[in-house]
């Protein structure tokens, strides 16, 4: 039996079902390249020391270590930060396990998408879509965040932007994301990511972080660290505006 378990964005977010799955497992694996994970919770609940899997373990080797545990007739857990099904690597592991005749249960967790909108007091009904801000590869910038935000703003919808993970496993800080977005504006020049564009940063949620709000130009100078997400809000409703101002630090 394979359990794909999300334990939320930080300490204290794991559900009772997630803890029970970890307690019942013979092998507990976790990955921390899609988000920082509360390893201490895993250690307290697991029968044996949790085993860290790298991106290479899951993607290049197709989760071989997890599949070996299953082949021995054991219960295996792959624990992730947030909600487990936001990463395609986890879907590939599910398919591989089922193809070998192993039953699979997905244990949902609190996703960064829901948590970020809740923390910032924004209406989930106005979420227009999600894109990832990436560092340029070979000098080439992905225009997906620009195109999505442009379409969403025209429709009165908020845009949630996930941030890149570096090759060394560290997370893109919000200031780098703001620089990338403004560099896209220099190329596209359609007024989407100007230095004056309002932005909401939800950073280190569950790890002592919080919510900050300010124009992209100010975010580019802010020294907060990742992991974080950026939200490019459309026009805020009265309740959204009042609540965001109450919970956010202005920069």
Swiss-Prot record:
The record's function comment reads: S-adenosyl-L-methionine-dependent methyltransferase that catalyzes the trimethylation of the amino group of the modified target histidine residue in translation elongation factor 2 (EF-2), to form an intermediate called diphthine. The three successive methylation reactions represent the second step of diphthamide biosynthesis.
Q: Give the keywords, sorted.
A: Methyltransferase, S-adenosyl-L-methionine, Transferase
Could you cite one Gene Ontology molecular function of this protein?
diphthine synthase activity
EC no.? 2.1.1.98
Q: Which Pfam families match?
A: TP_methylase
- Per UniProt, where does S-adenosyl-L-methionine bind? 83, 86, 111-112, 163, 205
Give the protein name, as stated in the record.
Answer: Diphthine synthase
Catalyses which reaction?
2-[(3S)-amino-3-carboxypropyl]-L-histidyl-[translation elongation factor 2] + 3 S-adenosyl-L-methionine = diphthine-[translation elongation factor 2] + 3 S-adenosyl-L-homocysteine + 3 H(+)
The keyword Transmembrane appears for this protein: no
Give TM segment ranges.
none
Q: Which organism is it from?
A: Pyrobaculum calidifontis (strain DSM 21063 / JCM 11548 / VA1)
Query: Known Gene3D superfamilies for this protein?
Result: Cobalt-precorrin-4 Transmethylase, Domain 1, Methyltransferase, Cobalt-precorrin-4 Transmethylase, Domain 2
Listed GO biological process terms: methylation; protein histidyl modification to diphthamide
Assembly behavior: Homodimer.
Q: Describe which pathway this protein belongs to, using the record's wording.
A: Protein modification; peptidyl-diphthamide biosynthesis
The record lists the lineage as: Archaea, Thermoproteota, Thermoprotei, Thermoproteales, Thermoproteaceae
**Which protein family is it in?**
Belongs to the diphthine synthase family.
């Amino acid at each position: 039996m394979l359990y794909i378990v999300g334990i939320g964005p930080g300490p204290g977010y794991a559900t009772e079902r997630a803890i029970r799955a970890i307690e019942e497992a013979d092998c507990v694996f976790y990955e921390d390249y899609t988000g920082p994970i509360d390893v201490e919770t895993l250690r307290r609940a697991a029968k044996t020391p949790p085993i860290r899997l790298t991106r290479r373990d899951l993607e290049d080797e197709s989760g071989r270590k997890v599949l070996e545990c299953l082949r021995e007739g054991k219960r295996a857990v792959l624990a992730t930060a947030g909600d487990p099904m936001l990463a395609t690597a986890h879907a590939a592991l599910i398919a591989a396990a089922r193809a070998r005749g192993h039953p699979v249960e997905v244990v949902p967790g609190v996703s960064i998408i829901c948590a970020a909108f809740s923390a910032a007091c924004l209406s989930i009904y106005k979420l227009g879509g999600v894109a990832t801000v990436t560092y340029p590869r070979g000098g080439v910038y992905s225009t997906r965040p620009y195109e999505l935000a442009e379409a969403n703003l025209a429709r009165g919808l908020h845009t949630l932007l996930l941030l890149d993970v570096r090759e060394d496993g560290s997370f893109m800080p919000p200031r780098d994301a703001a620089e990338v977005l403004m560099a896209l504006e220099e190329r596209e020049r359609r007024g989407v990511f100007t230095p004056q564009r309002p932005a909401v940063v939800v950073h280190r949620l569950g790890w002592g972080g919080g919510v900050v709000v300010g124009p992209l130009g100010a975010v580019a100078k802010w020294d907060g660290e990742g992991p974080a997400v950026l939200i490019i809000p459309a026009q805020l409703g009265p309740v959204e505006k009042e609540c965001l101002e109450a919970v956010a630090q202005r920069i």
